[in-house]
Amino acid sequence: MVQNILFDLDETLLDFKRSESRALSNMLRHIGVEPTEKVISRYSEINKSRWKLLEQGLLTRQQVKESRYEILFAELGVDYSAAEATAYYEDQLSQKGFMFPDTIKLLETLHGRYRMYIVSNGGSNVQSGRLADSGIGKYFEDIFISEDAGAEKPSREFFDYCFGRRPEIKADETVIIGDSLTSDI
């Protein structure tokens, strides 16, 4: 019998694409680049390819974060630190947690009937800020972030970390709800 629900955060409960678009546009304007559709589209291609390399174990999280800007800035002829761009982007990203239209309705329906937890591959500071802005943190008993766990979802090590921190979570009584078969389940 299901007792626990593990929810992915980005693109499951919160609209990451909307938050990302806002943060990216703000960062690009900050460094003097107009966030045109062409620039945003190219960033998206680079970003997706970098995250796939992370999933394959070929890049670290930090390498993903910085290399996407190194590549984009090189293509645009922009002389700006990828590390500084990453820091600015993450600060902007942490400020807004846009919810999907039925997020609150879903959480209110399930709250009290199940123990609910968040599991996320996002960064700790970013996710903490987005949760605070959205106000949905109150529905969850705990939040498990891959950065804190030292392992990415859906690795065994990540879920061992979750189960180790909360012994009441039993694998055979738990479901996970996410948007990606490769990075959630």
Language model region names:
Residues 84-85, 92-96, 103-134, 140-146, ...:
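Substrate-recognition element of Asp-dependent hydrolases with the DxDx(T/V) motif
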Residues 12, 19, 124-125, 182:
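Conserved Rossmann-like nucleotide-cofactor binding loop
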Residues 152-185:
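Conserved Lys-Pro-Asp/Glu-containing loop-to-beta segment of HAD-superfamily phosphomonoesterases
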Residues 13, 105-109, 181-184:
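Short glycine/proline-centered loop/turn elements that form peptide/ligand docking sites
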Residues 2-101:
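N-terminal helical cap/lid subdomain that shapes the substrate entry/recognition surface
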Residues 21-25, 134-136, 162:
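Glycine-rich, phosphate-binding/catalytic loops in enzymes
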Residues 35, 81, 138-142, 170-174:
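Short acidic capping loops at alpha-helix termini that bridge into adjacent secondary structure
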